[in-house]
Amino acid sequence: MITLSINDKRVETKAAEDTPLLWILRDHLNMTGTKFGCGMALCGACTVHVAGEPVRSCTTPISAVAGKKITTIEAIGATRVGKAVQDAWVVENVPQCGYCQSGQVMAAAALLRENKKPTDAQIDEAMNGNLCRCATYPRIRAAIKRAARTLAS
């Protein structure tokens, strides 16, 4: 039995310890906000926070995150930074197809938690591993800047 802390809730699972966190979230807990994209930690659609850091859940075994605080897209809006990012995403009309957006939001929230006023280069570096098939990168950057301004006020 492995115990996980997901969105401030204790979850126990009998899944194999090498089961990727993504499948516990989606298949066992029906938390479908975190997406499966590539399965190789290359696209960022599966990004969640583990102990405050962005992690690719598609390749992260549950044994590696047992006892650590896991935050998903379903709960990021409860934080000041996460709410600012989500609100900016709406104002800037970031999503097109929307598939990558949960991972994008999670990466942006992690960036703004650490860097309150990122430059374009810092935004690009932080968001580098999050792919968007629809190429909404200019709107993603604009939303991150808007969220940073909101957090500064």
Question: Which role does the model predict for each range below?
Answer:
Residues 1-153:
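Signature of N-terminal electron-transfer/Fe-S-associated modules in redox systems
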